[in-house]
C-alpha cells in the first residue's frame, strides 16, 4: 500500500475543489511536475518488487481515472501491465483510493464502493472504501479493501468519531465476508489516519498483532507493534498506514499464506532526506507547504507476501 500524496492531473474536475493543483495556482502544478510525480511513483512500485513487481498495489490520494491511466500506460510502470480499479468518491477535493492488479495472478471478479453517509453527522463527504474481489491460482477468492479514513483535521479527539464511524462500515463489510466465505482470505490496506492502538483499529476492527493462537475469522494488524513507521511527525515515526489480514491468511491453507515477519515498511534511501528541524530522516515530499520540493510522498510504502500470488493457468 502506498499513499502517493496528492496525485492530481493538471485539469479541473467539475464540482471538485482541485484548484490548488492547477498550473495557474500558487503551487504551480504543471504537466512536467505531474509526469515527474508519475515517474517517481512508478520507481517506488518497481523497487518493491525486486525481480517482479507486486501483484497488488493499493493507492490513496489519487484524483481520478485519468491519473491511473497515465501511471499504468505513460510512465515507467507501463511495462508491468497493470490493470486497475478506482472509486468515484464524493470527497470535496476529488481524491480517491485505487487498486492496481496483475491479471495473470488476480482475476477480477467484481468491485464495490462502500459509501460513508456523513450528512447525519454534519461532516463533509469523505472517500469511499474500495472492495475488490478476485480469484487467485488456488481457485479461492481474495477480498481486498482499500481505504483512506477521515483526517485528523480539527484535532484527534474532535475528528475521531468520523474515523470510528467509517471503521464500523468497513468492519460490517469485512465481517460479513469472513462469515460467508469457506476460505475467508481478506486483506485490508490503507491510510487510517490512526495508529494501531487507536480505537478505530484496535476496538472497532479488533485488529491487533498476531500473537499466540491465530483464529481464522478474526482480523490481525501486521503493522501493530512496529518500531519503524510510515509517517514522521515532529521527529517521531508512527504507523498511520495499516495492513490488516484475516486469520485465515496467517494459517497457511494455500499459497497466499503470510505472516507478521513477512510484512515490511520499506525505507529506501531515495525516499528519505534529512530532517533539519528534529534530526534523523524524514520522507521526501512533493511539496513543503506551497513550495515545490520534488520529492515522493509524505508516507513510506509497505508490502506483505500475500501480494506474491501464483500465476493463474
Task: State the predicted function of each range.
Residues 164-262, 266:
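Metal-dependent phosphoesterases centered on the DNase I-like endonuclease/exonuclease/phosphatase
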Residues 62-149:
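Structured beta-strand-rich core segments of catalytic domains in phosphoester-bond hydrolases
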Residues 15, 137-168, 172:
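Metal-dependent phosphoester/phosphodiester hydrolase catalytic core
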Residues 301-302, 309-312:
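Single conserved hydrophobic/aromatic residue that forms the stacking wall/gate
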